[in-house]
Amino acid sequence: YKNSSPMVRAYYMDDRWCRAEEPITCPPVAHAPVHWRLRGVDGPQPADWKDPMGKGAGPGVSFANEMFRLTGVPQGLICCAHGGTTMAQWDPKLKKDGDNSLYGAMLNRVKRNGGFVSGMIWYQGCSDAKEETIPLFRQNMIRFVKALRRDFRFPGMPFVQVQIARLIYTDATSDKNWTCIREIQRTLQNSIRNLLTVPAIDLELDDGIHLSGKSQIILGRR
C-alpha cells in the first residue's frame, strides 16, 4: 500500500516525522528501551533497518488516508505499538518507568509532539486470549482507556479498537478463547463511552493469525 499524500504523515519509532509509509511501526529501530528489551536485545537497529522477511503492515496508513479524504484535515500518526503484547504490559501504573514501559513510552512520544491527540486506534487482544487472562481483559481495557483520557487531558477522546480476527490451525480451546476476547471487545462500548469497535473476522489472513496486507487496507478504511 503506497501513500501518495504528503498530508498523511507519521512520527516513526525512531522519533522522526515523515510521509506515512508501511510499515509505520518498527520496534527494532525504536529509541525507547522497552521496545528492544521486549525483543531481547540491548539497543536499537539503525534507522535504515529493513525486515529481512519484507513483512510488516497495519491499518494505520489506510485509516489516515481515509480520514483525510473524508475531512480534508491533514493527518499525523504517532506510532507506539508493539506486536504480541498483553494488557498487563500496557499497564498505566508502569508509566513511572517512562521509556522502559510501553505506556510510559507512549506518553513521552505524545508529549514530544505537543501533548495532544485527537483519538486513538488500537489493535490488541490476541495475546490475552488465554484462560488466565480473559477474566481480567474487560477491566484492564476499562482502566486503560480511563487512564489514557486522564493523562491526555481529553475525557471524551475517541477510542477505536479492532475486534481481533479469526485464527486457523488451532485447537478448540484456542478458538474458544479468541471468541471470548472478541465478545468482550464487542460489548466494551456498553462500559466505555465514545468507544467504537471495528470487526476484522471476515477479512482474509496471510497466515494462521495475521491479516493480509490487502485486508489491512480494508480494515483501515472501515
Named regions from a protein language model:
Residues 1-222:
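Cell-envelope and extracellular/periplasmic
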